[in-house]
UniProtKB/Swiss-Prot annotation:
Domain FAD-binding PCMH-type: 13-183
Function recorded in the entry: Cell wall formation.
Name of protein: UDP-N-acetylenolpyruvoylglucosamine reductase
GO cellular component terms, semicolon-separated: cytosol
Lineage: Bacteria, Pseudomonadati, Pseudomonadota, Gammaproteobacteria, Enterobacterales
Principal location: cytoplasm
Keyword terms: Cell cycle, Cell division, Cell shape, Cell wall biogenesis/degradation, Cytoplasm, FAD, Flavoprotein, NADP, Oxidoreductase, Peptidoglycan synthesis
Catalytic residues (UniProt): R159, S229, E325
Length: 342
């Protein structure tokens, strides 16, 4: 148990794993998984560890997915990209813009790897991965069988997909296929983007605005460890939203296609005067209440205690119960984040 996980999670929480293996191709990944499984060890596959909280030492093998490569197919209607799971997401966004292939600009500066993007159906500023995803290539770990899932088969939801359910722990994502339509249409529904002029705006301007919003509001994990948005924005029924808005008319709310309403978790937390609140080494970020940070050598217990406190305060004030977006990892695998902080 002497391999530190600190460099492999952006929260910078110091726990250990029995083994850590970097896999640069599918075969190395399969070999590492099969070797660990044969020895009866649990296995966790990570990209950049930007959406995990290790609760304790991991009693198994952590495989770091570093499968690289970007292939582009130019079709009359769209650019089709085949991207290795180990590619850095933000570098991919920058690369596509430099090559004149817009469509990912709203998703700039989301931390992590391309392979993690379908698991969470990553999203920001009005765009989710499902908008541009053509397929996801995975490998069945027990058999080595290759499987390609269409976007529909991925069953994307809000921060959700089949990779959090039936495919969890059984399949590893090795590549993601993206479709970027040549008829670019800006999405300017959130934040400072609403100020941009839809008829003249360029993809680069959207990218710059998103980067500006993220860098001014969000902490740099190299300075204060964090995993980005700690909580999901809660999606509530129209009735719940109506009741809440009658009491708090200024609450940001986003009606969804199915009649439900998405609320802004950051606003709810902020209304409870929790910005800057610290427990042990963990704190609520002072600019963006949705982010919990490693202020001062935080232990995982500090983060859990703080998350519990935030959830309680928001629940008591608004009767809305926040759920973590971050994945909680116990000694032998993922555990329920909601149960851990309830």
């Amino acid at each position: 148990m002497n391999h530190s996980l600190k460099p492999w999670n952006t929260f910078g929480i110091d726990h250990n794993a029995q083994h850590i293996v970097c896999a640069e191709d599918e075969q190395q990944l399969l070999n590492a998984w099969q070797h660990a499984t044969a020895e009866g060890q649990p296995v966790l596959i990570l990209g950049e560890g930007s959406n995990v909280l290790f609760l304790e030492d991991y009693r198994g093998t952590v495989i770091i997915n570093r499968i690289k490569g970007i292939e582009i197919h130019d079709e009359p209607d769209a650019w089709y990209l085949h991207v290795g799971a180990g590619e850095n997401w933000h570098r991919l966004v920058k690369y596509t813009l430099q090559e004149g292939m817009p469509g990912l600009e709203n998703l700039a500066l989301i931390p992590g790897c391309v392979g993690s993007s379908p698991i969470q159906n990553i999203g920001a500023y009005g765009v989710e991965l499902q908008r541009v995803c053509a397929y996801v290539d995975c490998v069945e770990l027990a058999t080595g069988k290759q499987v390609r899932l269409t976007a529909k088969e991925c069953r994307f939801g809000y921060r959700d997909s089949i990779f959090k359910h039936e495919y969890q722990d059984r399949f590893a994502i090795v590549a993601v296929g993206l479709r970027l339509p040549k008829e670019w249409q800006p999405v300017l529904t959130y934040g400072d983007l609403t100020r941009l002029e839809p008829t003249t705006v360029t993809p680069q301007q959207v990218f710059n605005a998103v980067c500006h919003m993220r860098t001014t509001k969000l902490p740099d994990p190299k300075v204060n460890g964090n995993a980005g948005s700690f909580f999901k924005n809660p999606v509530v029924s129209a009735e719940t939203a109506k009741a809440l808005l009658s009491q708090f008319p200024t609450a940001p709310n986003y009606p969804q296609a199915d009649g439900s309403v998405k609320l802004a978790a950051g606003w709810l937390i902020d209304q409870c005067q929790l910005k800057g609140m610290q427990m042990g080494g963990a704190a609520v970020h002072r600019q963006q209440a949705l982010v919990l940070i490693n202020e001062d050598n935080a232990k995982s217990e500090d983060v859990v205690q703080l998350a519990h406190h935030v959830r309680q305060k928001v629940g008591e004030k608004f009767n809305v119960w926040l759920e973590p977006e971050v994945r909680f990892i116990g000694a032998s695998g993922e555990v329920s984040a909601v149960e851990t902080i309830s």
